[in-house]
Amino acid sequence: MKHLKLGLVQTGDPLKLCTDQYNAFCDAMKDVLGVELIQSEWEINGAEDAERIATAFEARAVDLTVLMCCSLVGDGRVIQPFIRSHQEVVVWCLPEPTREGPLLLNSMTCANLYTSSATQMSRETGGKRAKWIYGLVEDPLMMPRLLSSIRAIRARKSMQGATLVQVGKTAEGFINLGFDAEAIHDKSGVNVVFCSLEEIFRDMNAVSDADATALAGTIAC
């Protein structure tokens, strides 16, 4: 199992209204096998903070950054350094009281601003976008949605440097099965090579029965 580094950073929370959820998230991550939680030393209160934190996370080889929207801070530039980095980004939006309690902190507005900015940047970042999650840590869908991203990133890390072989051609007309091998390599580090059936049969026939039997004995099923 590949080790994964998860960075956690929050926007400014001067009234400490998000402290309980922040701590609950940290506690929940302790139970996720193979994940190292890296907490930012600073909150985000503007684009300069975001740049500094994204750089610090990049220096520590963070794979996934969770940006906790405690309040509406800055503008769309806040998310840009994270999107330009090698980190994947999840924007976490928290529910707020609708009938009573403290003044709204515009968490959803903040999340919408950041994810929209990331989407606008997708052309210059090879299609990279930010994923959003909504809810409290104890909600039934919040953590599973995040964990699906963690599993996907871990799978991609495990596949880096691997070689996939497509044997034979894609049947004519199945244009939906076409892909760009170079783009796959650039995005995931996976090499794709193509081999015809004729090449497979030729190489099979060139192997002696003794060598084939010896090789079969080394393959674990």
Give the predicted meaning of each segment.
Residues 1-221:
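An N-terminal assembly and electron-transfer interface module characteristic of large anaerobic redox
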